[in-house]
Amino acid sequence: YEISECLVGSEMCIRDSHSPVLFPIVGRVWNNTYRHKGQTYSLEQHGFARDMDFQLTYEEENAAIYTLESNEETMKVYPFPFVLEIGYRLKGNRIEVMWSVQNTGDKDLHFQIGAHPAFYYRDLNPETNERGFLDFGKKIKTLEYISPAEKGCVLPQRHTLTLHEGLMELRRDTFACDTYMFDNSQLKKITLLDKKQQPYISLEFNSPLVAVWSPSATYPNVPFVCIEPWYGRCDTVGYEGEFKDREWMQHLAPGKSFEASYSIILEDIE
């Protein structure tokens, strides 16, 4: 199997973007608005970076870095100067994705960042309910999660996912709840298995949250699942506090940088 047979590209995209970077927010702010120092701003789901053109600023045979800088348009909806870099490095059967956020302003920078890669189900038969499995680790018996409720935001209630030998079966109706958001650093690796429980792709990450999502509640025969490392998440229903006080926010002092990464591993390629 080649990389293109595992990672979903634009040809299978249901929305206008595929594998987008989520910045400067992950998910939604309540009513698509937020407050910062007495001003109210509007931001759509997952922020604006995924809709903007990045500049190629570094390139070699197996690596590249793309850069996005704040400008007049971003400052209208997000009043923070920044430089966002996304790096990619191919090493054997591993794709490393690296993020760098730099605060180029003279005041604290508040942000969230996340990934949204999508992966094909292997040997999908749309006429059946079976899709495959997610392996969270054989020692994990239960996981706590939250899911979107009103207007794409969450309620405080937590739910428990019970696993059998660390496995979550993926079926046509698995994502009736929309998204499983696992927080509090419960997971550091997720492996996607085929219907015979053979592993073919893994994600390794250090993010405090990771989400699992597929739009199968709306599109029952969609052929992919998303595994999404997040440094942040959507608002709680009804939140109207300050932007900087949202849950799971990241903060940078002037001149400081935030760096993080995750890896995609093709398990049956050496």
Predicted feature descriptions by range:
Residues Y1-I14:
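Short, small-residue-biased leader/transition segments that mark boundaries at the very start
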Residues H46-Y58, L163-E247:
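Acidic/His-leaning functional-site neighborhoods
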